[in-house]
Design a protein with these regions (language model features):
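S-adenosyl-L-methionine-dependent methyltransferase catalytic module, highlighting the catalytic core
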Residues: 4-54, 82, 101, 106, ...
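Conserved alpha-helix/loop element of class I SAM-dependent methyltransferases that forms part
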Residues: 49-69
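Conserved class I S-adenosyl-L-methionine
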Residues: 69-79
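Conserved SAM-binding loop of SAM-dependent methyltransferases across substrates and taxa
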Residues: 80-92
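A short helix->loop->beta-strand "cap" motif at the edges of active sites that frequently abuts
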Residues: 93-94, 172
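Conserved SAM-binding motif I beta-strand of class I
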Residues: 95-100
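A short acidic, Gly/Pro-enriched loop at the edge of an enzyme's catalytic core
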Residues: 131-143
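A short beta-strand submotif of the Rossmann-like class I SAM-dependent methyltransferase core
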Residues: 145-148
């Protein structure tokens, strides 16, 4: 029997309440104990970029692995569980392990750990920029690495990618996403004389973690993984960041960004200017 691929729309309907719940319960800036209804109204419409990002990553994973795939999965930099929990829901036969920096506020919270356990996910603490991943070689059949690359100090990039390569088994998958250095937004910022990066100062919410200190293009990521014995399976570029523009939900600037995103979805020639790239690599056997 042929299994129909998941529709993006159906995945979005599943992941949105998961993301909303994770942010409400574990977010660094969320009011402790806030009711679900109150929080939903507070962030109404603001989670669209995350919902779109996670839904696309889930669809790419399903396309590359199939719905009945088995084995060990690893997420580097699990954050509040935005991606980890949906991956566990849509890939129930994969045993997921999450790696997170142990200084994050939610890392030792019993509620956070219990939520991961309820989804059959294990949590491991590791400062990935300075410590080897605490796993044997070739352990994982799939590894997700979303919105983490851009936070890495440049001098530690090769160390982290070498560790990623080490723990993925031959034939295994790396599913990654990161802001696109060559996006239209970044080009416009540079033309205005503005920087596209944050200063490399540690984040106040966790020791030895950083904001966006280096962005990469899809071609750079391809080169970085090719020299480590990976082949590109698929690459998608997409913009979903109009939600973040201006304060008013109906502002003119925000409307222009939304119109551009709609145009980008319909004109393939514009997609190379997308805000975020999504790439799937397979480790050569």
């Amino acid at each position: 029997m042929t299994v129909q691929p998941l529709s993006r729309e159906s995945v979005e309907k599943t992941v949105e309440p998961i993301i909303l719940d994770c942010l409400r319960r574990f977010g660094d800036f969320s009011k402790p104990g806030i009711a679900a209804e109150e929080f939903a109204k507070l962030v109404e419409g603001e989670l669209r970029p995350d919902v779109r990002r996670i839904s696309l990553l889930v669809c790419l994973a399903q396309s590359a692995t199939g719905p009945d795939s088995k084995g060990e999965g690893l997420e580097l930099g699990c954050g509040y569980g935005y991606l980890l929990l949906p991956m566990a829901v849509f890939n129930p036969h994969i045993r997921w392990t999450a790696v997170e920096h142990p200084s994050r506020n939610y890392f030792n919270r019993a509620e956070f750990r219990q939520t991961l356990q309820d989804h059959n996910c294990q949590l491991v603490g590791c400062n990935i920029t300075h410590e080897p991943l605490p796993f044997p070689d070739a352990k994982f059949s799939v590894l997700t690495f979303s919105e983490t690359l851009e936070h890495l100090p440049v001098e530690r990039l090769n160390f982290v990618l070498d560790e990623i390569s080490r723990v993925i088994r031959p034939g295994g998958l790396l599913i990654a996403s990161s802001p696109n250095q060559a996006s239209l937004e970044n080009r416009l910022r540079l033309l205005k004389g503005n920087s596209i990066l944050d200063l490399p100062n540690p984040l106040p919410t966790a020791k030895d973690t950083f904001p966006h200190i280096r962005l990469y293009t899809p071609s750079e990521m391809s080169q970085l993984m090719q020299v480590r014995g990976f082949s590109l399976v698929s690459c998608v570029l997409e913009s979903n960041n109009s939600t973040y523009r201006d304060v008013g939900r109906k502002s003119f600037r925000k409307t222009l960004y939304r119109l551009y995103e709609l145009a980008e979805q319909r004109l393939p020639s514009l997609r190379r200017f997308g805000d975020t790239w999504f790439m799937v690599f397979r480790k050569n056997k």
